[in-house]
Regions:
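Cleavable N-terminal export/targeting peptides
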Residues: 1-25
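Predominantly the C-terminal beta-signal and adjacent terminal strand-loop region
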Residues: 86-90, 179-222
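Short glycine/proline- and aromatic-enriched beta-strand/turn motifs that initiate or cap beta-hairpins
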Residues: 20-68
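Hydrophobic alpha-helical segments of small multi-pass membrane proteins
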Residues: 109-111, 128-134, 164-174, 190
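Flexible, solvent-exposed loop segments that connect beta-strands
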Residues: 41-55, 85-106, 136-164, 194-207
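Short loop/turn motifs that connect adjacent beta-strands in outer-membrane beta-barrel proteins
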Residues: 21-26, 74, 118-125, 178-181
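Residues that define the transmembrane beta-barrel architecture of outer-membrane proteins
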Residues: 25, 59-63, 103-109, 124, ...
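Gram-negative (and chloroplast) outer-membrane scaffold detector with strong preference
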Residues: 35-39, 66-146, 211-222
Length: 222
C-alpha cells in the first residue's frame, strides 16, 4: 500500500514527460542578436545627375528575438522580432569617394513557415523555412554631401525617402536543446527585396537590397 503514492507520482511524471515530447501546440520564445547585411546592387540616379551615381549600404546588428508555434511535430510558424536596424547609405559608382550621403532605419516584418527535421524529442533539429518579409523603411536622413551632389544648398537641402517593399525570405537553421525547456537556436536567411529611393529634387534610384541575415539566440519552450 505504501508504494501506491509513489506509483501515482511516477505515472504523473511520465505522462508530463510524454506531453513535453509532443511538439504539436508547443510555443518557443527566444532572444538574442541579429545582423542584417544588404547585398546591394544599385541602379543609377535618374537625370539630371552625374552619370553612374549609385549608392551602397552597410550592415547593422541589433537585439532580436522571435516566437515559434509548432503546428505538429515537424511544421511550424515563426515570427522573428527585432528592434529597428540603422543603415548608413554611402556613395558608390562615380561618387564612391563621397562617403556618407544618408541613413535610414529599417524594420523587417517577417512570417515564416518552417519544417523541422528529426524526431520531436531530438536534441538537435535542423530546419528550413520560407515566407514573406515586409521591409519597412522610415526616418530617412540625408547629409550635406547628398545636397551638394544634387545641386541643393543649405536653405533647401536635398531629402530622401525609401519605398517600403515586400520580398521573399528563405531560411536555414538549427535548434539545440539544452534541457527539456531551454534551447539555443541559430539561423541564416536570405531576403530578396528591391526598393526605390526618391529625392526631393525629383530624382529616383532603384536598388536591389537582397540582405543576408544571421541570428543567434537562447530560447524557452512551453
Amino acid at each position: 500500500m505504501k508504494t501506491t503514492p509513489l506509483c501515482l507520482a511516477l505515472a504523473v511524471l511520465l505522462s508530463a514527460a510524454a506531453a513535453q515530447a509532443q511538439t504539436a501546440g508547443t510555443w518557443m520564445l527566444r532572444g538574442g542578436v541579429m545582423n542584417i547585411t544588404p547585398d546591394v546592387d544599385s541602379g543609377n540616379l535618374s537625370a539630371s545627375s552625374l552619370p553612374n551615381t549609385q549608392i551602397d549600404s552597410n550592415g547593422s546588428t541589433r537585439p532580436s528575438g522571435g516566437i515559434t508555434y509548432m503546428l505538429d511535430d515537424h511544421w511550424a510558424l515563426d515570427v522573428p522580432i527585432a528592434v529597428p536596424f540603422k543603415h548608413t547609405l554611402t556613395g558608390a559608382g562615380s561618387i564612391a569617394g563621397a562617403g556618407k550621403i544618408g541613413e535610414t532605419k529599417a524594420l523587417p516584418i517577417t512570417l515564416l513557415g518552417q519544417y523541422r527535421f528529426g524526431e520531436a524529442n531530438a536534441q538537435f533539429r535542423p530546419f528550413v523555412g520560407a515566407g514573406l518579409t515586409y521591409a519597412k523603411f522610415f526616418k530617412e536622413r540625408s547629409t550635406a554631401t547628398l545636397t551638394a551632389i544634387t545641386g541643393g544648398n543649405a536653405s533647401t537641402p536635398t531629402t530622401l525617402s525609401l519605398e517600403s517593399k515586400l520580398g521573399l525570405t528563405l531560411q536555414v537553421g538549427g535548434t539545440l536543446a539544452l534541457n527539456e525547456r531551454w534551447f539555443v537556436e541559430g539561423m541564416v536567411a536570405k531576403t530578396f527585396v528591391k526598393t526605390t529611393g526618391t529625392l526631393s529634387t525629383g530624382q529616383t534610384i532603384k536598388v536591389t537590397l537582397d540582405p543576408l541575415t544571421l541570428s543567434l539566440g537562447v530560447g524557452y519552450r512551453f
